[in-house]
Amino acid sequence: MQEARDAIDVPVHGCVVMPGFVDPGMQLSLFDSKDALRPRRKRLQSFYEESVALMRGCLQHGTLTAGIRARPVNGFTGSDVALLRQMARIGNNPVNVVRAWRIGWQGGECPPLEAINNTLTTLRKHRLATMVELGAHNLRSDSALLCMLNNAQMEVSLNWRGSDHDQLARALQAASPACVFCDSNLSSAECQVLAKSRSTAIFTAHRDLLEDAPGGSLRDLADAGGALALTSGYDAESENNFNMQWVVALAVMRLRLSVEQAIVASTINAAYAMRCGSELGSLEVNKRAEILVLNLDDYRELPRRLGTNHVGMVIRDGNIVLNRSRWRVGAA
């Protein structure tokens, strides 16, 4: 009762109150790969400052949890560990960060298992990552790589670019991934396989718009009862969008989701895709108070009023960390 009496009363009349957005598929690299033949490695301090600025931008646009994947350049590189160290140095301020290592593939071949095992040992020892992303097309049920991941107690995510649905089913059975990064042009058979699995399918609405992809598989997967999530697909070298409000709008206008489905896909479903849904992604008792106050009368206006940052206030762990509204604490 004492805590309730001491709490600040924040007026939100005429606003939308919702959980913070969760973006599970942001990709970062230590290399400036504009020159594909001779990518240049960034200075660690420069990368750190750029990443902090990016996380602040996410906060200002309503993304309170970001899944960061270390993206290799020209296959497997030791720079991934250095990148994840810098992200661990940033920690969970200004936003929550779930770090993942994306294993690089060279010509469709897996990097040396010894190098992978050494990297996994380092990641686990220093708590630099909790997830590892694999290419589903390169996976076998008897893979020594899966044994390594199991021993390292790492969650698995798959990268699937569409092919034989039987191959997808085998990969899902072998790896039991938390999530699968997919294109939006999946076949109906692939949608059925994903719908029957316990994995969350993650789609990039922004990329589908640029590539003029049909995007009908999201609706098909949702109708089949599958779990789907949305990501901005941010990549510093190719896709610079990190605004999840924009992603929700595109999912409704281009990918045939309802507003409710798009919001669920960018909050609670995305949180479960990164195995943090028990703490984040919805406004429930015993969950962390990660809350957005949007300057909208109705949540259904979000896709209709495209191009405006509607975030008026951000609350993290019960504390106001961003206030763009007219209300001030002294006015309480």
Please state what every model-predicted region is.
Residues 131-138, 155-162, 177-188, 202-210:
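Catalytic beta/alpha-barrel core
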Residues 153, 218-296:
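His/Asp/Glu-enriched, well-ordered alpha-helical/loop segment
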Residues 14, 25, 62, 69, ...:
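Divalent metal-coordination and catalytic microenvironments
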Residues 128-129, 148-155, 172-179, 193-202, ...:
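Glycine-enriched alpha-helix->loop->beta-strand junction motifs that scaffold or abut catalytic
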Residues 268, 285-332:
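C-terminal cap of metal-dependent C-N hydrolases
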Residues 38-52, 56, 66-169, 174:
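Metal-coordinating catalytic core of metallo-dependent amide/deamination hydrolases
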Residues 77, 110, 140-144, 164-174, ...:
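Histidine/acidic-residue-rich catalytic or RNA/ligand-binding cores of hydrolases
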